[in-house]
């Protein structure tokens, strides 16, 4: 293998998920504010679904073909299993968000056994946080070891294809929303110049008007 894979996009995306989880946790303590952050929650789900679905279809299979050791194969099985754990946790947040006071359970208002919004978000944050850490600590080094920059480019190209222009118009300013200065610099430096210009002139102002977290952040 020749060349080093640049994981900038992976890290900045993971960190954007973490920031959104922090925003959701902060809002969970105020049931009256749930409607205000619903747009941010829907975007979080959209971004996470895209990220995980392309990993499942185009990254893990490619990695499976490249590895030979049993420990590496177990790691890939763990990655897929961790993805599968996330969907029911997202559904639990949806259910709890419909009744943030906690009186509605997963089967309806007569079922008081469902988690409160704060509890559902805490479970999601724990599971997703552990998965992101696991991926960064073990899967990314394995990818660096056995895949090529061309392999990674193919994965990134599929991500962009599924995202489309409309998706990119939200993804780019979402990544920048609340990112530290150094992370913003690295992310913008990895983008083509026309994309950074589009973001500055069109996408960023439009993103702020969407008010994902109640107001421009």
What are these regions (language model features)?
Residues 1-217:
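Small-residue-biased structural context
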């Amino acid at each position: 293998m020749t060349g080093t894979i640049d994981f900038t996009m992976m890290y900045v995306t993971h960190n954007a998920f973490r920031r959104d989880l922090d925003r959701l946790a902060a809002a969970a303590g105020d049931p009256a504010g749930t409607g205000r952050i619903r747009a941010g929650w829907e975007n979080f789900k959209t971004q996470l679904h895209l990220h995980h679905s392309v990993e499942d279809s185009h990254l893990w299979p490619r990695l499976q073909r490249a590895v030979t050791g049993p420990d590496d194969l177990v790691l890939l099985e763990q990655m897929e299993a961790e993805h599968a754990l996330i969907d029911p946790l997202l559904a639990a947040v949806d259910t709890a968000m419909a009744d943030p006071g906690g009186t509605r359970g997963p089967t309806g208002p007569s079922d008081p056994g469902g988690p409160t919004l704060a509890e559902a978000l805490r479970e999601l944050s724990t599971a997703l946080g552990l998965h992101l850490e696991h991926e960064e600590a073990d899967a990314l080094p394995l990818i660096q070891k056995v895949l090529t920059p061309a392999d990674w480019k193919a994965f990134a190209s599929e991500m962009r294809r599924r995202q489309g222009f409309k998706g990119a118009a939200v993804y780019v300013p979402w990544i920048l929303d609340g990112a530290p200065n150094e992370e913003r610099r690295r992310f913008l430096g990895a983008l083509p110049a026309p994309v950074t210009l589009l973001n500055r002139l069109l996408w960023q102002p439009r993103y702020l008007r969407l008010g994902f977290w109640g107001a421009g952040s």
